[in-house]
């Protein structure tokens, strides 16, 4: 392992995807995270503005697309291959506008998770793992259909249409 070229170079795209994974229509690399003021100052000195700064949402990164005949929803996976989760679309409040591609986060409000699901559903202890477990299920039962209605998709990047600057999104 220590001498493994792929592991050293961290090339996620060289990994053969699992059967349940699909090639994403757009690459979804991990976003930079800044936790300390010093890191923010370093970032600002390295990159010219303008900037769009947002809070880090703790859920499952997703991509929603309506550029084909049917809408599609994917998880980020390794950024190149993710999971198709189209079966969740009908339970989420997603736009039906044609020809849009939006990146966002599937989350549950923390207060809602604590009041309705903490320790009650599959012994869930935190909201991120709770969301991940639901989203990654191949089939969902009637109880889970109701739970999924409590999940929000929070958009943070409009990929299509392409002419929108981040500050206009």
Regions flagged by a language model, labelled:
Residues 1-95:
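Phosphate/adenylate-binding "loop-and-lid" substructures adjacent to NTP/NAD/dNTP-binding pockets
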Residues 6-25, 32, 37-38, 84-87, ...:
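Catalytic nucleotidyltransferase
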Residues 27, 49, 58-62, 98-104, ...:
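Structural beta-strand/beta-sheet cores of well-ordered domains, especially the beta-sheet scaffolds
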Residues 34, 56, 67, 76, ...:
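Structured loops at beta-to-helix junctions and adjacent beta-edge loops in soluble globular domains
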Residues 65-67, 114-118, 141-143:
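Short acidic, glycine/serine/threonine-rich loops at helix termini
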Residues 94-117:
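Flexible glycine-rich surface loops and low-complexity tracts that mediate binding to linear polymers
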